[in-house]
C-alpha cells in the first residue's frame, strides 16, 4: 500500500445535506430491506408450504433459555421453560386455528418492524397496516395450502412466548417499585435514628458537630461565589450573608420549615408542657429560641407528641419571660404563659420573625460564646421533662433490647429445631435410598432367578433328549447283542459240529462283548443318576414357581377382597345415609300427621260447637209459615225448619214458647 499525503488546505468541503432528506434516504433503504425480507419469506412460505416466520420467536426463546441458564441457573431456566410450555399449550387448545395463525403471523411481523431504530413513525405504521391487511385479507382465509398440524405448535409459541415475557416484565416492574418503596422506608427510619443519636449527644458535642456542618456547607458554597456575585450585581442577595449566618438562626429556619410540614400533616395543637419565661437581653432571647427548638425537637421525635408549633414558637420569645444569667425569675404578671395558650395572630408572627432574623453578625457571635454557659446555668421545666422522657426512652430501649434478646433466642431455638429436622430429613432420605436399593436388588435377584430357571429348564430338556437318545442306543445295542449271541450260538454249534478249532477265538469275543455290556450298564446307571438329580431340581423349580403363583394369586385375591370391602363400606355408608334420610323423612311425616290430626280434631270440635249453637238458635225461633190469600200457590216453607237440624241429644225443648237455659 502506498502512503499518500493529503493537502489539508485543499480538502473538499462535503455537501451539506438536509437532515430531513438524510433521514428519508436512510429510512427508505431500511424499509425497502424490510419489504424484500417480507416478500422473500412469503414466497418461501408459498413454495415450501411452511411458515418460516414462526421460527424467529422460537429462536428468541432458545436464546432467552440459554441466557437464563447462563446467568440465573438451571432452576430458573427449567421454570421458565415450564411456564412457556404451559402458555403454549393453553394457546394451542383454546384459540381457534384461523385466529391463531392470524395473530401469530401479525405479531411476528409487527415485532420485527418494532425492533428497528426508528421506533413508531409513519413508515413503520404503514408497514404494520400493510402486514395486517395481507394477513387478514389473503392469508386468513387460505389455510389449506400448507401443513396446518406442523405449523400450529409454532404459531401457539408465537403467542404464548410474548405473554410469558410480558408477565415476567410486569413482575420485575412491580418488584422494582416495591424495592424502591422499601428503600425509602429504610431511609426514613435511618434518618429518624440518626436524628435520635445526634440529639442524644451532649449540647457541647452538638454545637461542635453543628459548627463542623456549617463549615462544610460554607466550603461547599464557595464554588458558587461567582454566581452569587452576579446575582448581587443584578439586584439579588449577596452570598456573604448566607455564610455569615450563625448556627441558631440556620437551625431556627430549618426547624421552622420542618414544623410547617408537621403542622400540615397533624394539626394537633400546642404542647401544654412548655413553660416560657421572658428575658431582658437579645442574647438570652436567641438562646431561649435554640433551647426551645431543641426541646420541641426532642418532644416531637422521642415522645411522639406532634405539636402544631410553627414559626411563632421561635419568635414569640421577645414577648415572653425567661430566666436571666443569675437564675432570677421575673415576677411580672406576664411571666408565665397559660398552659392552654392560644396561637398568636399572623401579623404579630411576621413582625417577630423579622425582628429575630434582622440581628447583626456580632450579636450572633456573642450568642455562640454565651450559649453553652447559659444552657448549663438555666434549666427550665421543659428540660426536666425532657430528662424524664429520656429516662423513659432508656427504659423502653432496655425493654426492646430484652425483647430482641428473647427473639434472638427464639430464632436460635428455631434454627436448632430446623437443623434437627434437616438431619432427620437426611436420615429419612438415606433410609429411603437404602430401601430403594434393597428393592432394586430384590428385583434383580428375582430376574436372575427367572433366568436361572429358564436355563435349567433348557438343560433339563437337553438331558431328556440325551436320555432318550441313549435309551435308543441301548435298545439298539441290546438288539445287536441278541443278534450277535444268536449268531455266535449258531456259529459255536456249527463249529462244534464241524470243527473244534475256533472255540478259543469265540470265547475271547464273548468276553469282550460281556465287558462292553458291563461298561454300557455302568454308563446307563450314571446317566440315570444324573437324570434323577435333574428331575429333583426340576421339581424344586416347579414348586418354587407354584409358590410364586400362589403368592400372586393370594395378592390378587387380597386386592380383590380389599376392593370388595371398600365397596361394601361405601355401600354401607350410602345405606346408612339413606336410612338416616328415611328416618328423618318419617319423623317429619309423623310430625305433619300429628299436626293434621290435631287440626282435624279441632275442626271436629268446632263443627260440634256450631251444630249445638244452630240447634239452640232453631229451638229459640218459632216456626213461621207464609201463605198468600189471593194466590192459589202452595204455602211457602219456612226459612228455618227443624227438619234441617240433625237429631242430637240436646236437653232443649223445641216446642217451648220462651227460651229457657239449661240448668247445670
Swiss-Prot record:
Transmembrane residue ranges: 28-48, 75-95, 120-140, 154-174
Cystine pairs annotated here are none
Residues bearing PTM Phosphoserine: 305, 332, 631, 634
Top-level taxon in the UniProt lineage: Eukaryota
Q: Which GO terms describe its biological process?
A: neuronal signal transduction
Query: What name goes with this protein?
Result: Macoilin
Keyword check for Nucleus: yes
Q: What is its main location?
A: endoplasmic reticulum
Places the protein is found: Rough endoplasmic reticulum membrane; Nucleus membrane
Q: Give the UniProt keywords, A-Z.
A: Endoplasmic reticulum, Glycoprotein, Membrane, Nucleus, Phosphoprotein, Transmembrane, Transmembrane helix
Q: Where is this region: Disordered?
A: 253-274, 320-375, 630-664
What is this protein's function?
Plays a role in the regulation of neuronal activity.
The similarity comment for this entry is: Belongs to the macoilin family.
Instruction: Say if the entry is tagged with keyword Phosphoprotein.
Output: yes
**What cellular component terms from Gene Ontology apply here?**
nuclear membrane; rough endoplasmic reticulum membrane
Species, as recorded: Pan troglodytes (Chimpanzee)
* UniProt-annotated glycosylation sites, renumbered to this chain: 324, 340, 452, 655
Segments of skewed composition (Basic and acidic residues): 253-265
Amino acid at each position: 500500500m502506498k502512503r499518500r499525503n493529503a493537502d489539508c488546505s485543499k480538502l473538499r468541503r462535503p455537501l451539506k445535506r438536509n437532515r430531513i432528506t438524510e433521514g428519508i434516504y436512510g429510512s427508505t433503504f431500511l424499509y425497502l430491506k424490510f419489504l424484500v425480507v417480507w416478500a422473500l419469506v412469503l414466497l418461501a412460505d408459498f413454495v415450501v408450504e411452511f411458515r418460516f416466520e414462526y421460527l424467529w420467536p422460537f429462536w428468541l426463546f432458545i436464546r432467552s433459555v440459554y441466557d437464563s441458564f447462563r446467568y440465573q441457573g438451571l432452576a430458573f431456566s427449567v421454570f421458565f421453560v415450564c411456564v412457556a410450555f404451559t402458555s403454549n399449550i393453553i394457546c394451542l387448545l383454546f384459540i381457534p386455528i384461523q385466529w391463531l395463525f392470524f395473530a401469530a403471523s401479525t405479531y411476528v411481523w409487527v415485532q420485527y418492524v418494532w425492533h428497528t431504530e426508528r421506533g413508531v413513525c409513519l413508515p413503520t405504521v404503514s408497514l404494520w397496516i400493510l402486514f395486517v391487511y395481507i394477513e387478514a385479507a389473503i392469508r386468513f382465509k387460505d389455510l389449506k395450502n400448507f401443513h396446518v398440524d406442523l405449523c400450529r405448535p409454532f404459531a401457539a409459541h408465537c403467542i404464548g412466548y410474548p405473554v410469558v415475557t410480558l408477565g415476567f416484565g410486569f413482575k420485575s416492574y412491580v418488584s422494582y417499585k416495591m424495592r424502591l418503596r422499601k428503600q425509602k422506608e429504610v431511609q426514613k427510619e435511618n434518618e429518624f435514628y440518626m436524628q435520635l443519636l445526634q440529639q442524644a449527644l451532649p449540647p457541647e458535642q452538638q454545637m461542635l458537630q453543628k459548627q463542623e456542618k456549617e463549615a462544610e456547607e460554607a466550603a461547599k458554597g464557595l464554588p458558587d461565589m461567582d454566581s452569587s456575585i452576579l446575582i448581587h450585581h443584578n439586584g439579588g442577595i449577596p452570598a456573604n450573608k448566607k455564610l455569615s449566618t450563625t448556627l441558631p438562626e440556620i437551625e431556627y429556619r430549618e426547624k421552622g420549615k420542618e414544623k410547617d410540614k408537621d403542622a400540615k400533616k397533624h394539626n394537633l395543637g400546642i404542647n401544654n408542657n412548655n413553660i416560657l419565661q421572658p428575658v431582658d437581653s437579645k442574647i438570652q432571647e436567641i438562646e431561649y429560641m435554640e433551647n426551645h427548638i431543641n426541646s420541641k425537637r426532642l418532644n416531637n421525635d422521642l415522645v411522639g407528641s406532634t405539636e402544631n408549633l410553627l414559626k411563632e414558637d421561635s419568635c414569640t420569645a421577645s414577648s415572653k419571660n425567661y430566666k436571666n444569667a443569675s437564675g432570677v425569675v421575673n415576677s411580672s404578671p406576664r411571666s408565665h404563659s397559660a398552659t392552654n395558650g392560644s396561637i398568636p395572630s399572623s401579623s404579630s408572627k411576621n413582625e417577630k420573625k423579622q425582628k429575630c432574623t434582622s440581628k447583626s453578625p456580632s450579636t450572633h457571635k456573642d450568642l455562640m460564646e454565651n450559649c453553652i454557659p447559659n444552657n448549663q446555668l438555666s434549666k427550665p421545666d421543659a428540660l426536666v421533662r425532657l430528662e424524664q422522657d429520656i429516662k423513659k426512652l432508656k427504659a423502653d430501649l432496655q425493654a426492646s433490647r430484652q425483647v430482641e434478646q428473647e427473639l434472638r433466642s427464639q430464632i436460635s431455638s428455631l434454627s436448632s429445631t430446623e437443623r434437627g429436622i434437616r438431619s432427620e430429613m437426611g436420615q429419612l432420605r438415606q433410609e429411603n435410598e437404602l430401601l430403594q436399593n434393597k428393592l432394586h436388588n430384590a428385583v434383580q435377584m428375582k430376574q436372575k432367578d427367572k433366568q436361572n430357571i429358564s436355563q435349567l429348564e433348557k438343560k433339563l430338556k437337553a438331558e431328556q433328549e440325551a436320555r432318550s437318545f441313549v435309551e435308543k442306543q441301548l435298545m439298539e445295542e441290546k438288539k445287536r447283542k441278541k443278534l450277535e449271541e444268536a449268531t455266535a450260538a449258531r456259529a459255536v454249534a456249527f463249529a462244534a459240529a464241524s470243527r473244534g478249532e475256533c472255540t478259543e477265538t469265540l470265547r475271547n469275543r464273548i468276553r469282550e462283548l460281556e465287558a462292553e455290556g458291563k461298561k454300557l450298564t455302568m454308563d446307563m446307571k450314571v446317566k440315570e443318576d444324573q437324570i434323577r438329580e435333574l428331575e429333583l431340581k426340576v421339581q424344586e423349580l416347579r414348586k418354587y414357581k407354584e409358590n410364586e403363583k400362589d403368592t400372586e394369586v393370594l395378592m390378587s385375591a387380597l386386592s380383590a377382597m380389599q376392593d370388595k370391602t371398600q365397596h361394601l363400606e361405601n355401600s354401607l355408608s350410602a345405606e346408612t345415609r339413606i336410612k338416616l334420610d328415611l328416618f328423618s323423612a318419617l319423623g317429619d311425616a309423623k310430625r305433619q300427621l300429628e299436626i293434621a290430626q290435631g287440626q282435624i280434631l279441632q275442626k271436629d270440635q268446632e263443627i260440634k260447637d256450631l251444630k249445638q249453637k244452630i240447634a239452640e238458635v232453631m229451638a229459640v225461633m218459632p216456626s213461621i209459615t207464609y201463605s198468600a190469600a189471593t194466590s192459589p200457590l202452595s204455602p211457602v216453607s219456612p226459612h228455618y225448619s227443624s227438619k234441617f237440624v240433625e237429631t242430637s241429644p240436646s236437653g232443649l225443648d223445641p216446642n217451648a214458647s220462651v227460651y229457657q237455659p239449661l240448668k247445670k
